[in-house]
Structures are given as structure tokens and as C-alpha cells.
């Protein structure tokens, strides 16, 4: 079973939201943005409900600073999107949380996936929302995530294609190397 929780900094203790708001207005020119909220979303599989409840209070959040909920309150938001690391990209937040839960339980390490959920408030056009997404999502390390709760966190990865092997590379002359570069689309 997959458990999900959302953790948000308390109002007045959320500098990341303030920084996003300032950057969007000043650098992106998104003047219609009046507020932003950010949640850290944790999906956890491989633990029992009592351990998950304990982890919500002791691993995923700092009770004096954070609000923990089962759902992100995005009722009046004009746009909501989530950002997660690309598959294969190391997720330090998820790994650290999994290690902490393993220490708490003295058992197996659970599977954890994290994402940041952004809610934007104000009068925004589709172009404004896309500009904010482009600003927040670094395509080298992250992608837009689904807002739906997954059935499982097990990854199903496709078998990678066979990599081409170049025979006789070390004995090629300049003309053959040049032809190889252009035929394989190589840069150097």
C-alpha cells in the first residue's frame, strides 16, 4: 500500500515561497501572481500505518515549523503542478527519509518517492503558468510529476537498446574517422 503525505512550511516560515513569488514577478514578469504555496510530497511504500504516522511527525516534518496533511489544499489556486526527479536521478530527500524510517523501524528500508507540489494564486494566463513551470523545472534533473497517487512505487524500466560497438577504431585514418563521426552523429 502506498501512503501519501504533504508537508508545508507554516505561514511566515516559508522563504522558498517568498523567493518564488519575487523571482516570478521580477525576473519572469508574471505580475498577476499574488501568492504561491509549496508542499513537499512523500509517497511511501513498504511500511505499516503506525510507522507512517510516526514518520510524518518525526522524519518528514519539523512540527514547530511545518504543517502535515493528507492532501494539498489547492482549492482557490489557478494552477497546480508537481515536480519530481527524473528516473535514475538521485533523490537525496527520499533516500534520507528512507534511511531515517529504516532506523526507526529497525527493519527494511521502504520505497519513497518525493515531489514538490506548487500552487499558484492570482490572475495568470496559460503563458504565465508555462513560464513559471519552465523556471521551476530543470529538465536535466527533474520533470513534471503526476498529481495522482500511484498504485505502487515499483519501477518498471524498459530494457535499454543495445549500444553500437565500433570495430577497428584505433586503426582508422582521418577519412574513416570523419565518416564515422558523421554517420554516428558524434561531436568529437
Language model: regions and residue ranges:
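Core nucleic-acid recognition elements
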Residues: 1-188
Amino acid at each position: 500500500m502506498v501512503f501519501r503525505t504533504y508537508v508545508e512550511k507554516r505561514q511566515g516560515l516559508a522563504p522558498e515561497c517568498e523567493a518564488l513569488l519575487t523571482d516570478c514577478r521580477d525576473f519572469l514578469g508574471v505580475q498577476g501572481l499574488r501568492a504561491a504555496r509549496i508542499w513537499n510530497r512523500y509517497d511511501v511504500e513498504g511500511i505499516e500505518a503506525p510507522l507512517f504516522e510516526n514518520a510524518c511527525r518525526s522524519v518528514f516534518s519539523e512540527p514547530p515549523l511545518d504543517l502535515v496533511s493528507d492532501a494539498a489544499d489547492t482549492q482557490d489556486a489557478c494552477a497546480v503542478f508537481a515536480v519530481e526527479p527524473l528516473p535514475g536521478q538521485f533523490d537525496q530527500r527520499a533516500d534520507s527519509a528512507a534511511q531515517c524510517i529504516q532506523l526507526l523501524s529497525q527493519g527494511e528500508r521502504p520505497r519513497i518517492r518525493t515531489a514538490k507540489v506548487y500552487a499558484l494564486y492570482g490572475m495568470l494566463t496559460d503563458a504565465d503558468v508555462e513560464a513559471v513551470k519552465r523556471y521551476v523545472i530543470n529538465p536535466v534533473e527533474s520533470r513534471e510529476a503526476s498529481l495522482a497517487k500511484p498504485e505502487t512505487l515499483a519501477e518498471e524500466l524498459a530494457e535499454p537498446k543495445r549500444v553500437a560497438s565500433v570495430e577497428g577504431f584505433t586503426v582508422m585514418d582521418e577519412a574513416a574517422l570523419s565518416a564515422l563521426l558523421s554517420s554516428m552523429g558524434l561531436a568529437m
